[in-house]
Amino acid sequence: TVQTLKRLRLEIPCLSSGCCLKFKNEYENVIFEITQYAILAQKLDTPYIRVLADLEPQPDGEVDDKYLSELLKELAVIAEKYNVTLLVETNGVYSDTKRLKALLDDVANSHVAALWDIHHPYRYANETPEQTINNLGDYIKYVHVKDSIIINGQVDYRLMGEGDLPVKDILSCLQKNNYNGYISLEWVKRWADHLSDAGIVF
């Protein structure tokens, strides 16, 4: 598979781990899973691994920032060993990107940065694109895009351009911040059955 990817000149820029870091009783599983992801990422020449510090897209319950900081410092040692960077997604309580910045500042390791899911800070923390960029700045190494509207107080995911996220403003802010990384359409049909099939979207 690795040789096929190289022959086709295809790159896998980011692996998405499924573990959630906030659960203290999952500590050993998190260490094991991230280690396995880091080994695979090195084999694939994949620079990034997405990690979830909180579980849900929206804030739901509290998270122990101090515990997460210490855990990320441990995980950073693993990431550095395999020359990959862990990207904490802007979801859950970390939709508040000031809080995420404070966490990343405390970790203070170049092998831990941010994945900006454009949806969650805008939708759940009422942040403008400018605020998110000002908060995270060069911590942003990878971007997930999706679109939605609110119906009866609930998020309803839509095709890009059919929601009300300020996508053009977001892309403009990234450009002004000299972002030159990947922008990935995250199609959440797994959690929103009404969405069109990926074949239609792509």
Language-model features and meaning:
Residues L8, D45, T97-W116, P121-F202:
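Histidine-acidic metal/acid-base catalytic patches
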